Regions:
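Cytosolic juxtamembrane N-terminal segment immediately preceding the first transmembrane helix
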Residues: 1-49
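12-transmembrane solute porter fold
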Residues: 33-49, 54-56, 75-77, 84-88, ...
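Hydrophobic alpha-helix/TM-entry signal in multi-pass membrane transporters
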Residues: 36-40, 102, 109, 125, ...
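Transmembrane alpha-helical cores of Major Facilitator Superfamily
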Residues: 45, 76-80, 107, 130, ...
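Interfacial helix-capping/hinge residues at the ends of transmembrane alpha-helices
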Residues: 55-59, 144, 178, 307
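Small-residue hotspots at the loop-to-helix junctions and early N-terminal turns
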Residues: 62, 66-73, 161, 318-326
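Helix-loop-helix hairpins in multi-pass membrane proteins, especially solute transporters
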Residues: 93-224
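Hydrophobic transmembrane-helix bundles of small-molecule transporters
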Residues: 183-298, 303
Length: 332
């Protein structure tokens, strides 16, 4: 047996290192992941655009549909159903894989957009918003599952950063673009224009999801039945939040009854779904969840009602209102 000389070993190590250096690092835009990355990030961008841009069109839509008194329900309808959609999507993805909840979520989101964009009455507009929320909740969680299954661990931070950018960019340009569309084409186009744009991202992403992320997340060990307790808790959160919103809109004494029922449903259900210690800001995940909830709630409240005030009370156009609303929100 011949023992390699030191110089031979050094040459072999040097050659191996040079090969590693020469090989290009795999990224989320490499050939193997390009179609999937572009497709799912585009879906996130479209959902983010609709979520951030709708506040600009809402004051005009509510005024034309004679539904300013129901204005808040157009937002609460979306968020309450999205809460249920997110929990149900997690259960569905664990047991059947992310493809089904993703496709159903996108279909529901598109249907809700069409319902809202073609609504002739405020109640139908709110129904469309609720369907949008259900679809949005299904999609968001399913996309996270896709990331966990389709990408290696070293690429997941990059695709999650792309998701974050997919929310940041529409939040900056979306309200202004929505205001211009509302002012020059009409508020309905803010809603009915999105379903057409989602076709191409779906065509890119779905074949890749089917080949890379199909099937139950747990494989053969995945639970066969849904977790009924969590689904009931999510439904209780949605119903409780809806009843509480209804009671807050009606200042008569009779509204105390639905308000009390809403609190009775909402508080225990939220305690059952959130990490233990969230309400006392316990160290770790509970405090993160609490702070994110407070920050998101404040931001959404400002983005929802400041444009309404600027359009109805200050006479600003839908194009100018987002800029003023954004500056006020940034100052807060």
């Amino acid at each position: 047996m011949t023992v390699p000389e030191p110089r031979d070993t050094e040459v072999a190590v040097s050659a191996e290192a040079s090969l590693r250096t020469a090989a290009p690092a795999e990224t989320v835009l490499s050939r193997a992941y390009r179609a999937l990355s572009v497709g799912i990030v585009s879906v996130v961008v479209l959902i983010a655009f609709e979520a951030t841009a709708v506040g600009t069109a809402m004051p005009v839509a509510a005024r034309e549909l004679d539904g300013v008194s129901l204005y808040a329900f157009a937002f609460s309808g979306y968020f309450t159903t999205s809460l249920f959609g997110m929990v149900f999507s997690g259960q569905w993805s664990d047991r059947r894989g992310p493809l089904a909840p993703l496709t159903c979520g996108i279909a529901s989101f598109a249907l809700g957009l069409v319902l809202s964009g073609t609504a002739g009455a405020m109640w139908l507009f709110i129904l469309g918003r609720a369907v949008q929320g259900l679809g949005g909740g299904l999609v968001v969680v399913a996309l996270y599952v896709v990331v966990g299954r389709a990408y290696p661990e070293r690429l997941r931070p990059a695709i999650m950063a792309a998701f974050a950018a997919g929310w940041v960019v529409p939040s900056v340009v979306g309200p202004l673009a929505s205001g211009a569309v509302t002012e020059h084409l009409g508020w309905r186009w803010v809603f009915v224009g999105i379903p057409v744009l989602v076709v191409l991202p779906l065509a890119l992403a779905l074949p890749q999801i089917r080949s890379r992320a199909a099937g139950p997340v747990g494989g053969a060990d995945a639970p066969a039945s849904f977790d009924g307790r969590r689904i009931r808790l999510a439904l209780a959160v949605s119903l409780g939040a809806g009843l509480l919103q209804y009671a807050a809109q009606d200042l008569r004494w009779v509204s105390l009854l639905p308000g009390a029922v809403g609190v009775a449903l909402l508080v225990p259900a939220v305690l059952g779904l959130l990490p233990r210690g969230t309400y006392r800001a316990a160290r770790g995940l509970p405090s993160v969840v609490l702070l994110r909830g407070v920050a998101a709630g404040s931001f959404v409240a400002a983005e929802s009602f400041v444009p309404l005030m600027l359009v109805t009370q200050r006479g600003l156009s839908p194009t100018l209102a987002p800029g003023r609303a954004g500056s006020r929100t940034g100052n807060v």
